[in-house]
Regions:
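Conserved structural motif at the start of ABC-family nucleotide-binding domains
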Residues: 9, 24-26
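Conserved ABC transporter NBD signature motif
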Residues: 63-74, 82
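Q-loop/switch helix immediately C-terminal to the Walker
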Residues: 92, 97-112
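Helix-to-loop junction immediately C-terminal to a conserved catalytic motif
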Residues: 55
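H-loop/switch region of ABC-family ATPase nucleotide-binding domains
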Residues: 193-195
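Conserved ABC nucleotide-binding domain
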Residues: 120-136
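The feature captures the beta-strand-to-loop junction immediately N-terminal to the Walker
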Residues: 40-42
Length: 252
């Protein structure tokens, strides 16, 4: 009997409701290790909700979400225990920090603080960000800071929401090189979301398109740097009441 391929995330019958509003309904989704995924969808498509659930920040209303074949554990208060080897670029801990950016990075990276300062905060428009309070920086600056921490933390699984939304072309190319380098040299599993595939399609192996909380299409990206072991799914979903799905065989 052939062995089942190891998965990072396995999602079955996932639903997420906020009162009477259903934000997400995903019948099945499998995330393979060492692969770069792009989740594409406009505002309200459910992409941020999906990342929050995968990160362990939010809990599904029904269905199962497994991380390496195990469900997320909760503490005695019912709060989800977040895995240390999963990094989410929009983790709530950023907003709860009351110190400066310098203090936050010093506490998180210790001796590596000076390296990070010279690498990202030495020149340019972000130089003054170093001494500002975390609670006072803008959404765009917080997004950029989350990207820096994502690249410097070296997690096993990296989740990035709203990739490229607040970047100019040079910033996007710089972070793209860092992300693909992590994937290529360290085997990091990376899941990024964006309202458009304009950037992500060039380096993601798998593109997942969401619409009103449903997956309606999955196709391979156009990346030329895929790992040999990556398996790319290409599935097309037809719209309609029953959302009948036609599945093509998996391709390596």
């Amino acid at each position: 009997m052939a062995q089942n391929k190891r998965l990072i995330f396995k999602v079955n019958g996932l639903e997420k409701d906020y009162g009477s509003y259903q934000a997400l309904k995903v019948k099945k989704l499998e995330i393979h290790p060492g692969t770069i995924y792009g989740i594409i969808g406009t505002v309200g498509s459910g992409k941020s909700t999906l990342l929050n659930i995968l990160a362990g920040i939010d809990k599904e209303s029904s269905g199962t979400v497994l991380y390496e074949d195990n469900p997320y554990e909760t503490n005695w208060l019912g709060r989800i225990k977040v895995h240390d080897d999963i990094f989410f670029s929009k983790a709530p801990s950023f907003n709860r920090s009351g110190g400066t950016v310098e203090q936050y990075i010093a506490a998180k990276f210790n001796k590596k603080k000076n390296v990070i300062q010279n690498r990202y905060f030495k020149d340019g428009s972000f130089k003054n960000l170093w001494t500002r309070n975390m609670k006072e920086i803008s959404v765009g600056e917080m997004n950029w800071l989350g990207m820096i921490l994502a690249c410097e933390t070296d997690p096993r699984v990296l989740l990035i929401d709203d990739y490229g939304t607040y970047f100019n072309s040079n910033m996007e190319k710089d972070f793209r090189n860092k992300i693909t380098g992590m994937n290529r040299t360290l085997g990091t599993t990376i899941i990024l979301s964006a309202p458009s595939d304009i950037y992500i399609k060039h380096f993601a192996s798998v593109l997942i398109y969401l619409d009103h909380g449903h997956i309606w299409k999955i196709r391979p990206g156009i990346s030329k740097n895929r790992n040999p072991g990556q398996r790319n799914d290409k599935k097309k979903y037809t719209k309609g009441k029953n959302r009948n799905r036609k599945r093509n065989p998996r391709r390596k």
